[in-house]
């Protein structure tokens, strides 16, 4: 009763023979939460002046409070199965009935939760009553049963909940406007109480929901922006998609302005607003902001890349759009450009970060004239003018992860509606250490240079980048789902069949990288993304390195390789700092297999220093005891102490474990 809407109150009045008072109750927006506070004097104000009718109302109300009408709830458990259960609001009794329908026992070992877009919310008994007796609550159809010891739904249960949520209309919060007289009498807590709870706890592992769910709940994922702006973006994306289908290609252009909430723009420090051609001068001369980099490159590291005009057909399906199909089509006429990561400055022999004119990333960012808080035609006009602007405006959404050097946010191209993962690195956070700052910029420049070259179905696609006075943004393909490490944390170890599938895809990505002379150097579960259809994407190239083909630097007498990577996944030659080759990734791949099979990193009983010592002493990680002979042979080959004896990624693709 307490959670009845005004419409349900009207239906109840009709059922007890008081339908003549429905209009007066509706005019005063009387809902279930108000019924307990109604007395005979207040009922007279609502038109029930007859004392006998008033007493009849109070008697029926008390009966309704003691014996509420049953509702139908749908529970999800056991790998996406659903069961309908009738409930009168008793949490424990309802849970016991639901568990019995799923052939589960001991209600004390289970609890109930719901998914709300990208979040999971555990349900208390009071919140359970709210859901039961609020007929407009969308959570009634997707209550998830989870173990109390590990209160996290399985992937199948979560997928089923998302499917149901996608089919539901967005829940509307009920806004009451009571008459002044009733407002002065009823308790404030009763007037303002909200039916839906907003205390949803985000996923600890930064879940990446599918684009369809983001589209249907877009305000949840871009909470700082006004819904009208987001709706306009989706509308524009549909219109632009229709026009682009008739053209031969689409120019991604330069990423520039971030559309900021009005409050953020007011407090925003001054930013670099300059054409790309002047950026070399601006950055090179500002030696106080960008410290010199001790490591030099002679000649400067130069990488061929292409303007982000088009994308290979094999990657068209990987682009995630909000409400539209992929925009990028190959026209076969890509123009090449040079991306100079380092150049000589006028300040001695030291190198500073700079970018040549015409390179694909545009390190420009400025506040947008669009006001997310405005409801005037300004919102409508500004987005339509984007076609004349060479830089692309984008909208920052929710936090979805962390990388080697910064946090990763959900982003959206304000013109096309394309979803992106935006790796954002705050430059000011390392200003206290010039040496660390220099290394950061060095690594980021290297990451961008590598990413520009890559185009493969199992590699996260680079889209662009920009720079302003306080942070660097790297725009990457949005991969719905999550990392292998996050899935292991939530669901436990993988079956060997699934491991084979994931490792085979990872090997294809490594084969592509190694064929281009690139060593990832940080293969681990946290850097392997899995989309919601099971496709693997290798990510986070923050410490990757491009090898010089036929170089002697990895042999005796060459430059000493750096100590880079995650300790538990390091190969012996990395720990000993003797060489870095593509075989380093093969050792880490073996560690990834163990991680997937056990849901723990290699050397689980060691801390980082102990693990490094054991690796340096050529002590192999312990193999899981219940794996197949082909898995054992695969691991033995990847863990060859002599890196020259380890097979290549191409050779491992023909191994029985994955073939």
Curated annotation (Swiss-Prot):
Domain spans labelled Protein kinase: 394-658
Domain SAM: 4-67
Annotated ATP binding sites: 400-408, 423
Gene Ontology CC terms: cell division site; cell tip; cytoplasm; division septum; plasma membrane
InterPro entries named among the record's database cross-references: Kinase-like_dom_sf, Prot_kinase_dom, Protein_kinase_ATP_BS, Ras-bd_By2, SAM, SAM/pointed_sf, Ser/Thr_kinase_AS, Ubiquitin-like_domsf
CDD domains for the chain: SAM_superfamily
Pfam families, alphabetized: Pkinase, SAM_2
Comp. bias (Polar residues): 354-365
Keywords: ATP-binding, Cell membrane, Cytoplasm, Kinase, Membrane, Nucleotide-binding, Pheromone response, Serine/threonine-protein kinase, Transferase
Keyword hit for Chaperone: no
Class of enzymatic activity (EC top level): transferase
Molecular function terms, GO-annotated: ATP binding; MAP kinase kinase kinase activity; protein kinase activity; protein serine kinase activity
Skewed-composition ranges (Low complexity): 180-190, 367-380
Subcellular location: Cytoplasm; Cell membrane
Disulfide bonds: none
Family annotation (Gene3D superfamilies): Phosphatidylinositol 3-kinase Catalytic Subunit, Chain A, domain 1 (3.10.20.90), Transcription Factor, Ets-1 (1.10.150.50), Transferase(Phosphotransferase) domain 1 (1.10.510.10)
Catalytic residues (positions): 522
PANTHER family: MITOGEN-ACTIVATED PROTEIN KINASE KINASE KINASE 19-RELATED, SERINE/THREONINE PROTEIN KINASE
Subunit record text: Interacts with rad24 and rad25; these prevent its translocation to the cell membrane during nitrogen starvation.
Physiological role: Serine/threonine protein kinase involved in conjugation and sporulation. It is thought that it phosphorylates the byr1 protein kinase which itself phosphorylate the spk1 kinase.
UniProt family annotation: Belongs to the protein kinase superfamily. STE Ser/Thr protein kinase family. MAP kinase kinase kinase subfamily.
Name of the molecule in the record: Protein kinase byr2
Species of the source: Schizosaccharomyces pombe (strain 972 / ATCC 24843)
Upper lineage: Eukaryota, Fungi, Dikarya, Ascomycota, Taphrinomycotina
